[in-house]
From Swiss-Prot:
Mg(2+) binds at E25, D27, D85. This is Dermonecrotic toxin SdSicTox-betaIIB2ii. Dermonecrotic toxins cleave the phosphodiester linkage between the phosphate and headgroup of certain phospholipids (sphingolipid and lysolipid substrates), forming an alcohol (often choline) and a cyclic phosphate. This toxin acts on sphingomyelin (SM). It may also act on ceramide phosphoethanolamine (CPE), lysophosphatidylcholine (LPC) and lysophosphatidylethanolamine (LPE), but not on lysophosphatidylserine (LPS), and lysophosphatidylglycerol (LPG). It acts by transphosphatidylation, releasing exclusively cyclic phosphate products as second products. GO terms for cellular component: extracellular region. Keywords: Cytolysis, Dermonecrotic toxin, Disulfide bond, Hemolysis, Lipid degradation, Lipid metabolism, Lyase, Magnesium, Metal-binding, Secreted, Toxin. It comes from Sicarius cf. damarensis (strain GJB-2008) (Six-eyed sand spider). The active site is at H5, H41 (nucleophile). Disulfide bonds join C45-C51, C47-C190.
Length: 274
């Protein structure tokens, strides 16, 4: 999976897909009551990137629905996963539940359209910190209460804050999640990062019966050398400001026979066993 990073402007969707991404990550900014308002990262962000692009969240969902609906004039077959970077760290922790209700409701209304939409992308809910676990509970409660639990098949969760992996596992168990789990590891492209935690996450992914890391990805990669190093470790995906660079590396002799771009037929909630 190659995730285009910080795709918050509508015009950026095609830009990152044209560069080779098959997934996009966008930031969800909330008001202090937990209402999802806009796609917006804000300052600071990655070196060399403009942090200020934004779109009304519901408008973004309406647009991306078209892009991920087969038969729609805007359909782009390669876009198979949407990663929602939930900026919950900017609101009081007690509002995490309200935020989960709001995001689920807006996905129901504007992306899935309560059964009318044929939009098919997988959804990855990226939470910054384990303290925000009530968002997950609220999201699932809302789908259940509204009668649309079938959408859980397309939804996964992921914690992005580089916290202790055992704490992550405990929190996921607390909210009853033991499948559809990704594990991120990374840092802004402005800095270098070691691979100890990433290696441990990969080890857990490859442990039979471990259900809290079906896929492991690294963020945010810009250097060719870093991409090569992490591919050698066996990551399932990367997030990058330059998807075209990732595509280039994947075509190199060392990796061409070991990796390929994920397609819609690849299940993101299933461990790859070769």
């Amino acid at each position: 999976w190659i995730m285009g990073h910080m795709v918050n402007g509508l015009e950026q969707v095609s830009e990152f897909l044209n560069l080779g991404a098959n997934a996009i990550e966008f930031d969800i900014d909330f008001d202090q009551n937990g209402v999802a308002k806009i796609t917006h990262h804000g300052i600071p962000c990655d070196c060399g990137r403009l942090c200020t692009k934004q779109t009304v969240f519901t408008e973004y969902l309406d647009n991306i629905r078209h892009v991920t609906t087969p038969g729609d004039p805007k359909f782009r077959e390669q876009l198979i996963l949407l990663a929602l970077d939930l900026k919950l760290q900017r609101i009081p922790v007690e509002k995490a539940y309200a935020a989960g209700v709001d995001v689920a409701t807006k996905l129901l209304d504007h992306y899935w359209q309560r059964g009318k939409s044929k939009a098919r992308a997988y959804i990855l809910l990226n939470l910054p910190l384990v303290q925000d676990y009530e968002f997950i509970r609220a999201f699932k409660d809302t789908l259940k209460n509204e009668g649309y639990e079938q959408h859980n098949d397309k939804v996964g969760v992921n914690f992005t804050g580089n916290e202790d992996l055992d704490e992550t596992r405990k929190v996921l168990k607390k909210v009853g999640v033991d499948k559809h789990v990704w594990q991120a590891d990374g840092i802004t492209s402005c800095f270098a990062r070691g691979t100890d935690r990433l290696t441990e996450a990969l080890k857990r992914r490859d442990t039979p019966g471990y259900n809290y890391a079906y896929k492991v990805y690294a963020w945010t990669l810009v250097k060719y050398s870093t991409m090569r190093r992490l591919f050698r470790l066996g990551v399932d995906g990367v997030m990058s400001n330059f998807p075209d660079r990732v595509v280039e590396v994947l075509k190199e002799e060392e990796f061409a026979d070991k990796f390929r771009m994920a397609t819609y037929d690849d299940n993101p909630w299933k461990k790859f066993t070769g």
